[in-house]
């Protein structure tokens, strides 16, 4: 069907709203990527007296005081990590960083990722052939057709590589939560206007992964026009005070799960696990990337696709905090897992393995147990953050679901109210049963 003329579009705001909501396909989209080359970070006065904003486009230009506001040991927003992700960026990803000043003193900061979210490409189940009865197949085709035109240029306040609140930090001794969130929203709006001046027009803003129990920030964001929606829980294993060794952890299990763990260890004896240094990661770079894609390609929902050089860039930037462990069968790398030390917690980062070997060697389950052992005996942290996906098997090793909420705001007011419903409609559903290896379930 021939699209309406330009004259008609100019006379019909609703038509323009619809067109901006359904962004064009990749082939049609000729808008340039944001320009990160010029990073003079001009200071902008905000609406609150004495408060100013600096927008940086590269982590290398962030001042040293950026790290000073972070909680002790926080790595996901550190300059070291941010520089590493820029050296090996995810496909189609750009970055921006906000610094908030009050009376010339830094009182807040936010790390943003800029990407185009293409629904059909990033939700695997929509790409598959429909199954089920006639109505189920019809519903699948409707969702697929709708999703094929549901594309957004997003400012993501947070980190798509992780689950959890790695979006912003504010000094709450100088700002109350409502004031902090008002500044965050104003800063993100300033960023959107700055990007539009470069030729990259954002359709919406996503602030990701606030904990359900956090009552201050969500309320403030809703007052700013954001709508919250739950999106798959973060699986977290908190350690008990009397767990000093991995054996202590095993002894706390009920018999059924302890037997299961020992059975997995027995199956895993056919593999050799070794920590990989920078040289080994570089040597195995192709294999690591292939193994990562073996698993990432099977995930129903993927917000990003890592580049081949990501693991090496991270190891070079954070040699002590970032660790990679390889699993070998007869000197052939068949799997790997990675961890990132983040203050009082150990983050289970990306992993990969040969799916056809998983059952015989209980490869994935052994990786989970190994990360628990490392967290207890080597890193000596308080918890392991296992992130999203594979919820049931993670609960079988003791991880508990922590509800996370994302907050979204479409920059077109016509569709802002409808967006949360669309997100819930398209969200992949994972049916699972929580396990209780320590009893009480």
Region spans (language model):
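N-acyltransferase acceptor-side catalytic subdomain
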Residues: 1-441
């Amino acid at each position: 069907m021939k699209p309406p003329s330009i004259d008609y579009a100019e006379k019909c705001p609703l038509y323009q709203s619809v067109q901006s909501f359904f962004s064009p396909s990749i082939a049609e989209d000729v808008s340039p990527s944001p320009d990160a080359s010029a990073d003079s970070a001009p200071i902008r006065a905000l609406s609150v007296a004495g408060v100013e904003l600096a927008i940086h486009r590269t982590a290398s230009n962030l001042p040293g005081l950026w790290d000073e506001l972070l909680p002790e040991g926080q790595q996901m927003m550190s300059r070291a990590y941010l520089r590493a992700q820029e050296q090996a960026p995810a496909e189609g990803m750009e970055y921006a960083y906000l610094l908030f000043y009050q009376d010339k003193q830094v009182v807040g900061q936010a790390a943003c990722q800029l990407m185009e979210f293409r629904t059909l490409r990033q939700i695997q189940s929509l790409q598959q052939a429909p199954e089920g009865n006639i109505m189920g197949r019809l519903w699948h085709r409707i969702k697929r057709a709708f999703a094929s035109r549901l594309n957004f240029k997003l400012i993501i306040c947070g980190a798509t590589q992780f689950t959890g609140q790695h979006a912003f930090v504010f000094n709450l001794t100088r700002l109350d939560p409502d004031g902090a969130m008002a500044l965050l929203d104003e800063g993100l709006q300033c960023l959107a206007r700055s990007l539009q001046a470069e030729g990259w027009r954002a359709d919406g803003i996503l602030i990701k992964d606030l904990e359900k129990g956090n009552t201050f920030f969500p309320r403030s964001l809703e007052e700013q026009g954001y709508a919250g929606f739950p999106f798959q829980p973060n699986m977290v294993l908190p350690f008990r005070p009397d767990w000093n060794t991995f054996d202590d952890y095993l002894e706390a299990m009920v018999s059924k799960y302890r037997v299961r763990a020992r059975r997995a260890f027995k199956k895993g004896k056919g593999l050799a696990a070794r920590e990989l240094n920078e040289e080994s990661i570089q040597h195995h770079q192709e294999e690591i990337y292939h193994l990562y894609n073996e698993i990432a390609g099977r995930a129903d929902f993927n917000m990003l696709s890592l580049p081949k050089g990501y693991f090496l860039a991270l190891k070079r930037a954070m040699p002590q905090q970032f660790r990679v462990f390889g699993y070998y069968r007869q000197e052939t790398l068949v799997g790997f897992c990675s961890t990132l030390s983040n203050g009082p917690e150990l983050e289970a980062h990306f992993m990969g393995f040969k799916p056809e070997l998983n059952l015989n060697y209980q490869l994935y389950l052994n990786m989970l147990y190994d990360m628990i052992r490392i967290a207890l005996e080597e890193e000596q942290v308080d918890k392991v953050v296992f992130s999203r996906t594979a919820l049931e098997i993670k609960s079988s090793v003791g991880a508990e679901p922590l509800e996370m909420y994302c907050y979204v705001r479409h920059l077109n007011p016509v569709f802002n109210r409808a967006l949360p419903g669309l997100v819930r409609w398209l969200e992949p559903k994972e049916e699972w049963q929580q396990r209780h290896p320590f009893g009480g379930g």
